[in-house]
Amino acid sequence: MIWNPSPNFGERSLPISMIVLHYTGMQSGAAAIDWLANPASKVSAHYVVDEDGQLVYMVREEQRAQHAGLSYWRGVTDCNSASIGIEIVNPGHEFGYRPFPEAQMDTVTRLVAELVRTYGIHPRNVVGHSDVAPARKEDPGELFDWEALAKLGLAIKRPSVNLVDPGWSDATFLSALERYGYGIADGKAATVAFQRRFRPTNIDGAIDGE
């Protein structure tokens, strides 16, 4: 692990109860780390995981990194104060989104496991940036291997049985999303975020009862 400190942090106002996963969305890992360490950027993350699995530590866990922005999850409106932010090097949808290499996923999995164990974080609170800011963000995206985390009990699995309830409605679905944790002020954005994570092969924003 490499220590590369960012000046962009503050004091937490909430205990750590979440992990928020991002992709860097820049053309290289070095560019992303430079940006996160730049005072002018006003953004940061606790950790960056490069494509070769190298782990970079940028903000101490007890401090509030600036990674989630305007966000909401399960009643928390200051996700930065409640979370550990992990940036995963990937060009993202703007610069050539691609699968996450095995070495990178191995490091992400080990890091998440350690943080879950250290802070007693519930798997429901291991989330993506798109989960907490669905109207603004789409990372870590549909190629991220959530199933790898879920198999280890580090994140929530997608239900294995699909039910189409004759009494199902858009309002029922959005209410279920809200109970799960999503902010539903923008219902379609929340639906897309849910699909991106749990039905990544068909992200159409349609509420179809699946």
Where are these regions (language model features)?
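Basic/polar, cationic surfaces and motifs that engage anionic cell-wall
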Residues: T77, G92, Y97-A185, A189-E210
